[in-house]
Amino acid sequence: MKEAEKIEELLGRGVDKIYPSRELLEETLLSGKKLKLYQGFDPTGDKLHIGHMVGLRKHRQWQDLGHEVIFLIGDGTGEAGDPTGKKKTRERFFTSEELRENAKDYLAQARKIVRFDGPNPIKIMYNGDWLNKLTKTDILNIAEHFSVQQLIERDMFQERLKKRESINLREFLYPLLQAYDSVHMEVDLELGGSDQTFNMLAGRTLLKAMKYKEKFVMTTPLLSDSKGIKIGKSEGNVIALTDEPNDLFGKIMSL
């Protein structure tokens, strides 16, 4: 397959949206420029599921095209607790130690799909390495680029307000922490599920404000079950990559 055909497949298959535009990203790739990109994974469980497969397959495509790909373990963001899609505040928040322990299983499972060694290996990083070192001044400098109105506009927060459910300040600030990942690593592109669009665009805003650098965002479609509910840990309909082959087949066929 020719390089142009590989780029066409990368941008056209298993992709929901590209920001600011597919045309600009395609032009950049056809110019021969190699990008630095990442996807973050908060290991709030110990199993990757088929919903992660779409992103991991994209990782492999970017990797095979010679780009610098980072598999980011969100042990720092995971402590804050991503509120995306959650109708209530979590009953408990994870510690950095718990998240790093879960990450071992994530990496073992991801190795079956992407390469962490050999030619152009995917890099493994932990955002706790820099988020845990942020000072008060650092956090204030990040926060000044966002408004409460911007953050509170999110669908799940609006739904909570209507139902008089609490919004924990810890999870409220989550997008700012994820946004800082892009700044610290100075990436060219962030990859993630379409439900992460708000968080990823926050990173685009912050990177432009703090480093004067533009970042592409590529979102992948979410997998849903037969009821149209997103497959995920919180929804309780996970189909884990570690399931026995027969169980895995049966669960997939029931979607």
Protein language model regions, located:
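Catalytic beta-strand/loop signature of glycosyltransferases that borders the donor
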Residues: 74, 218-221
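Non-catalytic terminal extensions that flank enzyme cores
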Residues: 1-43, 229, 236, 246
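Divalent-metal (Mg2+/Mn2+/Ca2+)-assisted nucleotide/phosphate chemistry catalytic cores
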Residues: 93-219
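Active-site rim/loop-helix segments in enzyme catalytic domains that contact anionic ligands
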Residues: 60, 67, 71-110
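N-terminal catalytic cores of NTP/NDP-binding nucleotidyl/phosphoryl-transfer enzymes
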Residues: 21-83, 191-197, 203
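Catalytic adenosine-cofactor/nucleotide-binding cores of aminoacyl-tRNA synthetases and other
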Residues: 144-147, 221-255
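Short, hydrophobic/aliphatic alpha-helical segments
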Residues: 32-40, 69, 174-184, 243
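Short, hinge-like loop/turn segments at secondary-structure boundaries
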Residues: 86-92, 141-143, 234-235
